[in-house]
């Protein structure tokens, strides 16, 4: 289950974003985005396709330049050049070293990040990659490609992990397994920002939500806080999203 709001309230704010705006010519993709993220929480960026979730992740990661933005990490300015020190971004559809076997790719990243063999073995088991270690990356299904990238992300040392649609390509049982991996990751101290369009998945795994529509924030809070705001005491995230957008 997601962390309780009382636990979140006592965790320090690690990332603060204010006045984030991104334009493509005359089109405003993101308008005056503001959000905070606390240590050890799972924050969900929620919205339909085209809401601005991926663009927001790419701006936060420094992949795309913002037209305006102020980012702070633990109270200190976080310019694009420093973001790779504190965050790791897992975009949708990435397949590293396409012609290499999965085991070799994982061993490479474990070496880069100086992770012991036992640590790598635990991650491989946790994300369910054992059956495909001998396969080449290009031959993996979408679900196993996701598992591979999640394993790479878990090997990295950065305290903040950004993921775009982490459950895409999984069935219900597999989704629950990966949710468990992410929740254990957060419980161990890492902070996660997940872009999710499946609201039921988000409701199950995220501690707080940023509701996006047309590049604007329409609501921020825990499920209980959003229920209070919308006067929907038993409302689902879907009902709340519809009420606010």
Outline where the language-model segments fall.
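Helix-to-loop junction immediately C-terminal to a conserved catalytic motif
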Residues: 61
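Conserved ABC transporter NBD signature motif
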Residues: 68-83
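Conserved ABC ATPase "signature" region
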Residues: 107, 111, 117-133
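Catalytic Walker B motif of ABC-type/P-loop ATPase nucleotide-binding domains
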Residues: 161-165
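A short, surface-exposed alpha-helical micro-motif characterized by mixed small hydrophobic
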Residues: 202-204
């Amino acid at each position: 289950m997601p962390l309780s709001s009382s636990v979140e309230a006592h965790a320090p704010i690690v990332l603060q974003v204010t006045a984030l705006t991104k334009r493509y010519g005359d089109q405003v993709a993101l308008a005056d985005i503001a959000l905070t993220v606390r240590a050890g929480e799972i924050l969900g960026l929620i919205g339909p396709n085209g809401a601005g979730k991926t663009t927001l992740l790419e701006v936060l990661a420094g992949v795309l330049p913002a037209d305006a933005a102020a980012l702070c990490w633990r109270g200190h300015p976080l310019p694009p050049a420093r973001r790779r020190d504190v965050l790791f971004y897992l975009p949708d559809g990435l397949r590293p070293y396409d012609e290499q076997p999965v085991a070799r790719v994982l061993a490479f990243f474990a070496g880069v990040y100086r992770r012991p063999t036992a640590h790598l073995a635990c991650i491989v088991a946790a994300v369910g990659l054992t059956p495909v270690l001998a396969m080449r990356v290009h031959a993996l299904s979408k679900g196993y490609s996701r598992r591979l990238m999640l394993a790479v992300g878990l090997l990295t040392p950065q305290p903040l992990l950004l993921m775009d649609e982490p459950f895409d390509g999984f069935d219900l049982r597999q989704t629950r397994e990966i949710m468990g991996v992410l929740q254990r990751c957060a419980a161990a101290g890492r902070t996660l920002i997940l872009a999710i369009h499946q609201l039921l998945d988000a409701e199950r795994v995220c501690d707080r939500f940023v509701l996006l529509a047309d590049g604007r924030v329409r609501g921020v809070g825990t499920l209980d806080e959003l229920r209070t705001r919308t006067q929907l005491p038993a409302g689902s995230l879907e009902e709340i999203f519809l009420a606010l957008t």
